[in-house]
Amino acid sequence: MIREEFFPTNVYGKDIKLNNHELAQNIFNWSAQDPGVNNTNVKSWHSTTDMASKPEYHPLVDELMIMCKDVFKEEWLDREPVLGNMWANINPKGGSNQPHIHPNSLFSGVYYVKSNPQAGRLRIHDPRPGAQIVMPNRRKGKPPKHLWRDANLDPFPGRIIMFPAWLWHCVEPNQSND
């Protein structure tokens, strides 16, 4: 039998070293001074989208741009990346983000400043609408990735995750007290 894969969806990850304690403190201070905005966030705080322009976040912006360049190279894109909107989310216990995409962007990403295993995983959804038409019964056990309909990515402090902006994703409710 010959098997080939077509139309894969690449999700990229990279672990970086930044002063996450300082980043977290800056974000908490920002949230205390700014009511934020309501987008996909549920029971949580979503900052305005001008985070990249604030000097205290430039070390993170620099790391994001390095990764963006690597992703663009991997994806055969013949252009330089431009960082558009950037914001912070704080999801307290019960906080989450509803399923959404990011229009007018090529890639989107997440950076985890602070997290733990119960803090709410990033869930990405199979982008193929036709794949949802029939959901056959499967054998017992964990099927191979090409048969998954959703993938749950665990949050780790210091991790960047980048994915196509058209990929539907959400954040599960934070079950921790942190």
What are these language model-derived features?
Residues N89-M162:
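Catalytic core of non-heme Fe(II) oxygenases with the double-stranded beta-helix
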Residues W45, L122, V171:
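Short clusters of hydrophobic/aromatic residues that line enzyme substrate/ligand-binding pockets
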